[in-house]
Amino acid sequence: MPKRICHHCGQPLEIPESAIGENFNCPNCGKDILMPPAHVAQREKIKLTVLPPPVENYSASQLAQLARLIIANVQTVIVGKEPQVTLAIAGLFAEGHILFEDVPGVAKTMLSRAIAQSIGCTFKRIQCTPDLQPENVIGDFILDPTTGRPDFRFGPLFAQMVLVDEINRASPRTQAAMLEAMGEGMVSMDKVSYRLEKPFMVMATQNPIEQEGTFRLPEAQMDRFLLRLSLGYPDAAEEKKMCERIQTQHPIETIQAVSNAA
């Protein structure tokens, strides 16, 4: 049977011949995917499409209530910073992306993880360095030894919530590889387009103080971000509360989803 990788959960799949080109239910995560074999996708340019989650019609009051629920859940992990957390959730609801400009160690990664876990989304972290290649972010075609055909292996950009740490340390070529994903919600590789699952959100960070060995983000890249935020250092009372919370177990390990990606 043809083998593929489910980019929802990253687990390998064995697809029956009868299911090729049809909607296939992943036995690991239970999500529907359309998985044509790699050689067919290359030859006939068949687009691998992820079925969108069901959309419900929410009223403004229901959306506000849901937002407050997510914010309260995130703040079980993040101490203080209510304005920044509120803006981050607003950016999520607006299908935008966020750029955090701040020094290391102020819970940027923790905030991203807390939001992802609060809404039941997949989460990946990309650590940017000057030698990071676009293929390390998007994915690449790898020869399958069992079939002798190239098979596309999805990169971390295919998660629903992606933290791009120190984005300005990546080369301009690698930064540009994220433009299509952030602007169009899809990734093109070898003339084949792969649509990203919604919600899709990029949270990127950069250190505004340390500029050595960095590449300034171009205007086209900056335009992809809806919000530009800074968390800042906690005060003494917040530091005390943080220490009290992690006495037994870090709250990020126990946070539960209060909503789903739909």
How should these model regions be labeled?
Residues 1-47:
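Cys/His-rich metal-coordination motifs, chiefly Zn-binding "fingers/knuckles"
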Residues 61-98, 103-106:
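Pre-Walker A (pre-P-loop) alpha-helix and adjacent loop at the N terminus of AAA/AAA+ ATPase modules
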Residues 86, 93-95, 106, 119, ...:
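Short loop/turn elements that form and flank the Walker-type P-loop nucleotide-binding site
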Residues 87-90, 143-163:
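Conserved alpha-helical scaffold flanking the Walker A/P-loop in AAA+ ATPase domains
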Residues 93-129:
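Walker A/P-loop
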Residues 132-148:
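Conserved NTP-binding/hydrolysis module of P-loop NTPases
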Residues 144-149, 170-174, 182-259:
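Canonical AAA+ ATPase core
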Residues 165-166, 177:
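Walker B catalytic acidic pair
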